[in-house]
From Swiss-Prot:
One of its GO terms (cellular component) is chloroplast. The gene is rps14. It is found in: Plastid, Chloroplast. Gene3D superfamilies: 1.10.287.1480. HAMAP family: Ribosomal_uS14_1. Binds 16S rRNA, required for the assembly of 30S particles. Keywords: Chloroplast, Plastid, Ribonucleoprotein, Ribosomal protein, RNA-binding, rRNA-binding. InterPro entries: Ribosomal_uS14, Ribosomal_uS14_bac/plastid, Ribosomal_uS14_CS. One of its GO terms (molecular function) is structural constituent of ribosome. This is Small ribosomal subunit protein uS14c. Belongs to the universal ribosomal protein uS14 family.
């Protein structure tokens, strides 16, 4: 189980990312449309003004049940060992263990 502080920190980053998403997207669009290099630098400075934690690259996908940030499966939202336990206990419909 991940520490509660890390989970709350991740939730805070998600809120910040949603808040500044439109600003980042519009700034990037402006940079691609303007041919002047000096104007691009000004817009690039504006792009750096939002908080660092509002960048989408700083977000991690976390396990739904344990909060583990690594080895997550997108389709289920679970980490690898929890996914394996749930499949073995038949708690995930449609998921089967492979055998060949």
């Amino acid at each position: 189980m991940a520490k509660k502080s890390l989970i709350y920190r991740e939730k805070k980053r998600q809120k910040l990312e949603k808040k500044y998403h439109l600003i980042r997207r519009s700034s990037k669009k402006e940079i691609s449309q303007i041919p002047s290099l000096s104007e691009k630098w000004k817009i690039h400075g504006k792009l750096q003004s939002p908080p660092r934690n509002s960048a989408p690259t700083r977000l991690h996908r976390r396990c739904f049940s344990t909060g583990r940030p690594r080895a997550n499966y997108r389709d289920f939202g679970l980490s690898g060992h929890i996914l394996r336990e749930m499949v073995q206990a038949c708690l995930l419909p449609g998921a089967t263990r492979s055998s060949w």
